[in-house]
Design a protein with these regions (language model features):
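Single conserved hydrophobic/aromatic residue that forms the stacking wall/gate
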Residues: 1-12
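Basic, Lys/Arg- and aromatic-enriched nucleic-acid-binding interface segment
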Residues: 96-128, 152
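Short, charged phosphate-coordinating catalytic segments
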Residues: 121-142
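DNA/chromatin major-groove-contacting recognition/catalytic segments
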Residues: 157-161, 167-169, 250-266
């Protein structure tokens, strides 16, 4: 039964043979562990991979294979993916011009919720997990305090212009409660990432810059551009150490080149 089930992964809609090989190997490993694809077995299998100290990237591949296979079985399963720690690359942060271009694009859509999502991320420096807890009432009131990473309390302020825009929009469309809600319920990291990639393509923005955390980096870079107080920024970002925050003072390749050409005139 196992070999027959594993072969089924090859009939999924996978465009590249290399991808099929990866998925086939992943499912083979799964069926060496369990006889049936169900949520309990899948969770135990993922836990066993973590105990083997496999990299988050490898585990994510295994999860993708299982999800595709479960879809083929017409018993779709969605599993939680381990996070891949992103190393900050100052070249992969949206520029102010790109940020404004994205906002203009989203503002022109029938559903302006996503315009507000980007505006909030770009003006608060919130992590996605914090952003998911904001309410429309928080934004309209101008601030909120949340218990976040490491059981620390963090206060978020909302820009006056954003408050006013949100107040008008919420009244017109009856928006209340949890802020980050899409067509199918609360926004997930995966769903939001997919939206960002599509929007980035429309706006001509590099896909490497189109992930939720990039707007936290954008906020930090913009804040330091206006205010050199790294200690205050560390507090706003909820960093335990100022050393973590100092990385935002680094300049991108384009910024360095521009500064060089402006200053080296002798």
């Amino acid at each position: 039964t196992r070999s027959r089930q594993v072969t089924g992964v090859q009939t999924c809609a996978l465009p590249i043979s290399h991808t099929v090989d990866i998925y086939y190997t992943s499912m083979k490993k799964y069926f060496e562990y369990a006889n049936e694809v169900n949520m309990d077995n899948c969770r135990r299998f993922i836990k066993s991979l973590e105990e083997e100290k496999l990299s988050p990237a490898t585990i994510r591949l295994r999860i993708t294979a299982i999800e595709r296979f479960s879809k083929w079985l017409k018993k779709p399963i969605e599993l939680k993916r381990p996070k891949i720690k992103r190393k900050l690359d100052v070249n992969n942060v949206p520029t102010e011009e790109e940020y404004n271009r994205l906002l203009e694009y989203l503002k022109g859509k029938n559903n302006k919720d996503y315009y507000f999502f980007i505006k909030v991320l770009g003006t608060t420096g919130a992590r996605l997990s914090e952003f998911q807890r904001f309410t429309w009432e928080d934004i309209i009131s101008g601030e909120v305090t949340l218990k976040g990473k490491g059981n620390k309390y963090r206060r978020f302020f909302f820009q006056k212009q954003l408050q006013q825009e949100a107040k008008v929009y919420a009244k017109e469309y009856g928006k209340t409660g949890i802020f980050a809600v899409g067509r199918f319920g609360p926004i997930t990291q995966r769903g939001f990432s997919q939206h960002l990639k599509v929007w980035g393509k429309h706006c001509g923005i590099d896909s490497k810059k189109m992930h939720a955390h990039a707007f936290r980096h954008f906020f930090a870079k913009m804040f330091l551009k206006k205010n050199k107080d790294v200690i205050q920024l560390a507090d706003l970002l909820g960093h335990g150490s100022v050393d973590t925050t100092r990385i935002y003072s680094q300049k991108s390749y384009d910024e360095q080149k521009k500064d060089f050409n402006r200053n080296v005139t002798w």
